[in-house]
Amino acid sequence: MAASPRVSLPVGCIGAGRMAQGILEGILHKGEITPQNVMVSAPTDRNLEKLKARGCCTSHDNRSVVSNCRVVFLATKPHIIPSVLQEIYPKVTADHLIISMAAGVTLETLEKNLPPGSKVIRMMPNLPCVLQEGAIVFSRGRCAGEVEADVFESLVRTCGLCVEVPQSCIDIHTGVSGSGVAYVYTFAEALADGAVKMGMPSALARQIVAQTLLGAGKMLLQSEEHPASLRADVCTPGGTTIFGLHELEKGGLRAAVMNAVEAATTRAMDMGRK
């Protein structure tokens, strides 16, 4: 792979689901790579139509993607990855950078099922990447160096936060951020339902809850303070917030959330052992 981190070479993606489309949209958002330089494969046209309309090249042949692109994202379901790797093996060269976003599939598994010396990156995004507000972590395989890391980061930076981590943190990221989006939606639904119970119209409740979560998240990011400190700022002695928090404590909210992260992380680890 060329020594420059600036990517103008064709980018491929095997798989065209919602996460793949989100990552590709982020890549195209920068404008450095045109849709004509993106090639995507999927078994059927159902998920390819939107990308085709965007101007991307599409195919039903995974090997064609690898033959035509030097950077290739693997965006299939985890249980499909072994067959995909077997299929593309003859086409992968030392010039390729293979990037997997499949939950639970380790770097060791990827490297074992690709030609020796293959440059591999394992990434884990989350759903807000489709709006360029995601959180991505990644780890490099043994043969992927700083150049490959720079290429990867230059591609996905517009999708949101992007951080290189030890591989041991990727399954944890799956549990806290990949799955965490669903926890937040569940909490948002409960907040809105509480407002509806007290008499607020449902549409208004959802709008206010969404803005509340957005504002709280921005404050957490921008202030760099511990969540407990920000929470304490909202709690006046004898006020409404401390009464509400007391009910959350009685319901075991924090323990339940911690258990959810543990369960999802453990599941991701189990998937990697299969």
From Swiss-Prot:
- One Pfam family in the UniProt entry: P5CR_dimer
Main localization of the protein described in the UniProt heading: cytoplasm
As recorded in UniProt, its EC number(s) are 1.5.1.2
UniProtKB keywords: Amino-acid biosynthesis, Cytoplasm, NADP, Oxidoreductase, Proline biosynthesis
Task: Read off the InterPro entries from this record.
Answer: 6-PGluconate_DH-like_C_sf, NAD(P)-bd_dom_sf, P5C_Rdtase_cat_N, P5CR-like_CS, P5CR_dimer, Pyrroline-COOH_reductase
The annotated pathway is: Amino-acid biosynthesis; L-proline biosynthesis; L-proline from L-glutamate 5-semialdehyde: step 1/1
Which GO terms label this protein's molecular function in UniProt?
pyrroline-5-carboxylate reductase activity
Example of a GO cellular component annotation carried by this entry: cytosol
Establish whether keyword Amino-acid biosynthesis is in the entry.
Answer: yes
Reaction(s) the record says it catalyses: L-proline + NADP(+) = (S)-1-pyrroline-5-carboxylate + NADPH + 2 H(+); L-proline + NAD(+) = (S)-1-pyrroline-5-carboxylate + NADH + 2 H(+)
Q: Does the keyword Cytoplasm apply?
A: yes
Supply one GO BP term: L-proline biosynthetic process
Question: What subcellular compartments does it reside in?
Answer: Cytoplasm
Among NCBIfam families, the record links this protein to: proC
What exactly does this protein do?
Oxidoreductase that catalyzes the last step in proline biosynthesis, which corresponds to the reduction of pyrroline-5-carboxylate (P5C) to L-proline using NAD(P)H. Proline is synthesized from either glutamate or ornithine; both are converted to P5C, and then to proline via pyrroline-5-carboxylate reductases (PYCRs). PYCR3 is exclusively linked to the biosynthesis of proline from ornithine.
Family note: Belongs to the pyrroline-5-carboxylate reductase family.
Q: How does it assemble?
A: Homodecamer; composed of 5 homodimers.
Q: Which protein, by its recorded name, is this?
A: Pyrroline-5-carboxylate reductase 3
The organism is Xenopus laevis
Q: Which gene encodes it?
A: pycr3
